């Protein structure tokens, strides 16, 4: 995907799927943020999950949505995401479910094929 303006919509959907997204303690949860970051990186910058650089503009948008003061917070947080995904089956199952739900919504809206 290339259209970064869709990321806030994806976050809204993510919140709907996860539930209770407006609560500060939920938004502040590291696992909550990591899973969202993983999904966005998988959609917009999959090479970042294999050690590459995050596509231009993605960090800034994620930082704004997730309440970071600087985009470097995103880089610091996503370091463990791939490890957790590969090593913890419950973590992986959560992400797989969330990713599938979001992709289905993107397809329904005609944003991807």
Task: Label the model's feature ranges.
Residues 1-16, 107, 111:
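General nucleic-acid-binding
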Residues 14, 59-60:
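Generic structural marker for isolated residues within well-ordered, non-membrane alpha-helices
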Residues 30-57:
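Short, amphipathic alpha-helical "recognition" segments used to contact nucleic acids or chromatin
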Residues 60-77:
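Short, basic interhelical loop/turn and adjoining N-cap
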Residues 85-107:
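Short Lys/Arg-enriched helix C-cap and helix-to-coil transition segments
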């Amino acid at each position: 995907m290339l259209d970064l303006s869709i990321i806030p919509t994806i976050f809204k959907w993510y919140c709907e799927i996860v539930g209770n997204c407006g609560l500060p303690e939920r938004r502040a949860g590291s696992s909550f943020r990591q899973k969202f970051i993983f999904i966005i990186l998988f959609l917009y910058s999959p090479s970042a999950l294999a050690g590459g650089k995050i596509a231009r503009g993605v960090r800034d948008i994620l930082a704004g949505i997730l309440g970071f003061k600087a985009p470097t917070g995103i880089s610091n947080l996503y370091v463990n995401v791939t490890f957790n995904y590969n090593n913890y089956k419950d973590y992986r199952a959560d992400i797989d479910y969330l990713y599938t739900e979001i992709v289905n919504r993107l397809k329904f809206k005609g944003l991807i094929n």
